[in-house]
């Protein structure tokens, strides 16, 4: 008799995805982040569900309901901070996951990569609408500033913004619909993640060498299940360190002030994981230009397969490209720093230079260096 896990209609799907899946024998810890993202998503959906049981999406009571969760609900404070810091962990894993894809040439799996980019946009949208819900000062003004960017769209811009707001300013209607979006989007993300996995399992995983590993595959369980559990434990350790010792480290103090449309905070800035894009947006002294640069800074990932000029897939044997990759990482960290600093003398020019460098590296320098490396290897 064959094993039930191989015959049962539901169990065989799980079996083929997580147990008997043929996996390359040499994938490093950088390949752990896919499963960590899955864990983050499950954690966010669960904590979010319990928060939604006590939250009210009304401008009069939203801020108070979050305070009530933290003060009066059993373990409400830990659920709230796990959800808030869980989002930060989600984005850390997401950025590493994308960086891994860039470094090892995983973007040559076109469908998997493109669904990944759609997932990135969806997660960013979810995080943005979620940040509005506590209805603090930064929630309100962040929502006002970011939604207002749509007014840069010619002809239909103003109507579009008022349609999204449900009125002439960010108000009760906006908060209610943002709560609805924030509730539904994680389930869309979960569905997209399954499609992402489906396409990945059509080709099998990439590996650090970028060379096909069909001749040397090992079963996913127990080898990578154990490896993923180790990653998960480290993720939870790091998350709980944040939650229990420094829950407000990554938050904004302004969000502990209830939203007030009559009082603008001196520095409006989003959560840390959007700062790089915010810096690119601010570095262009034109509204429409800034919005286009903001969208293009993420959308540029879709072009990666087209910009790949190297005859090797991975960067592991390409020291010049490696150097450029780490310059890109440093540039993104610089943009993140600039996004959180005030719009004044040294920061403006640094932000503009870092933004130019970002697009220059991806669109010009990387394809150019790859071609040079091909010639150096006399290919």
UniProtKB/Swiss-Prot annotation:
* Compartments it resides in: Mitochondrion inner membrane
Question: Where mainly located?
Answer: mitochondrion
* Residues reported in the UniProt entry to bind a ubiquinone: 201
Where do the annotations place heme b b562 binding?
83, 182
Please list every transmembrane segment annotated in the UniProt record, as residue ranges.
Answer: 33-53, 77-98, 113-133, 178-198, 226-246, 288-308, 320-340, 347-367
This protein's membrane topology, according to the annotation, is:
Multi-pass membrane protein
- What is a biological process (GO) this protein takes part in? mitochondrial electron transport, ubiquinol to cytochrome c
Q: Which GO terms describe its molecular function?
A: metal ion binding; ubiquinol-cytochrome-c reductase activity
Entry's cofactor comment: Binds 2 heme b groups non-covalently.
List residues binding heme b b566: 97, 196
Q: Which cofactor is recorded for it?
A: heme b
Record's Gene Ontology CC terms? mitochondrial inner membrane; respiratory chain complex III
Show the Gene3D superfamilies listed in the entry.
Cytochrome Bc1 Complex, Chain C (1.20.810.10)
| Keywords attached to this entry | Electron transport, Heme, Iron, Membrane, Metal-binding, Mitochondrion, Mitochondrion inner membrane, Respiratory chain, Transmembrane, Transmembrane helix, Transport, Ubiquinone
Family, according to the entry, reads as follows:
Belongs to the cytochrome b family.
Query: How the protein assembles, per its UniProt entry?
Result: The cytochrome bc1 complex contains 11 subunits: 3 respiratory subunits (MT-CYB, CYC1 and UQCRFS1), 2 core proteins (UQCRC1 and UQCRC2) and 6 low-molecular weight proteins (UQCRH/QCR6, UQCRB/QCR7, UQCRQ/QCR8, UQCR10/QCR9, UQCR11/QCR10 and a cleavage product of UQCRFS1). This cytochrome bc1 complex then forms a dimer.
| Role played | Component of the ubiquinol-cytochrome c reductase complex (complex III or cytochrome b-c1 complex) that is part of the mitochondrial respiratory chain. The b-c1 complex mediates electron transfer from ubiquinol to cytochrome c. Contributes to the generation of a proton gradient across the mitochondrial membrane that is then used for ATP synthesis.
What else the UniProt entry mentions is: Heme 1 (or BL or b562) is low-potential and absorbs at about 562 nm, and heme 2 (or BH or b566) is high-potential and absorbs at about 566 nm.
UniProt protein name = Cytochrome b
């Amino acid at each position: 008799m064959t094993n039930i896990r191989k015959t049962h209609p539901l169990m065989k799907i799980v079996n083929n995805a997580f147990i008997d899946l043929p996996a390359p024998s040499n994938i490093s810890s950088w390949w752990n982040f896919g499963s960590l993202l899955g864990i983050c998503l499950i954690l966010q959906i669960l904590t979010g569900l319990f928060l939604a049981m006590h939250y009210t999406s009304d401008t009069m009571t939203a801020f108070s309901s979050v305070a009530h969760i933290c003060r009066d609900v059993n373990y409400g404070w830990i659920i709230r901070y796990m959800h808030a810091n869980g989002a930060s962990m989600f984005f850390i894993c997401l950025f590493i996951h994308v960086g891994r894809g860039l470094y090892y040439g995983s973007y040559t799996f076109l469908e998997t990569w493109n669904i990944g980019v759609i997932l990135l946009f969806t997660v960013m949208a979810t995080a943005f609408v979620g940040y509005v819900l506590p209805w603090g000062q930064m929630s309100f003004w962040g929502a006002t500033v970011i939604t207002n960017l749509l007014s840069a769209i010619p002809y239909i811009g103003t109507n579009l913004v008022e349609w999204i707001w449900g009125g002439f300013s960010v108000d009760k209607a906006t908060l209610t619909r943002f709560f609805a979006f924030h509730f539904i989007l994680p389930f869309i993300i979960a569905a997209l993640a399954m499609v992402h996995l489906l396409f990945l399992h059509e080709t099998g995983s990439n590996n650090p060498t970028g060379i096909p590993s069909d001749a040397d595959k090992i079963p996913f369980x127990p080898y990578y299940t154990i490896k993923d559990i180790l990653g998960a434990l480290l993720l939870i350790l790091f998350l709980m360190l944040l939650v229990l010792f420094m829950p407000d480290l990554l938050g904004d103090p302004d969000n502990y002030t209830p939203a007030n449309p009559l009082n603008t905070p001196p520095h409006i800035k989003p959560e840390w994981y959007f700062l790089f894009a915010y810096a690119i947006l601010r570095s262009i002294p034109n509204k429409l230009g800034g919005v286009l640069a903001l969208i293009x800074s993420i959308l540029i990932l879709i072009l990666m397969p087209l910009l790949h000029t190297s005859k090797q897939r991975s960067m592991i044997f390409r020291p010049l490209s490696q150097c450029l990759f780490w310059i890109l990482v440093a540039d993104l960290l610089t943009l993140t720093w600039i996004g959180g600093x005030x719009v004044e003398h040294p920061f403006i020019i640094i932000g503009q230079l870092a933004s130019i460098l970002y697009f220059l590296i991806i669109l010009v320098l990387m394809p150019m260096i790859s071609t040079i490396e091909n010639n150096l290897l006399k290919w």
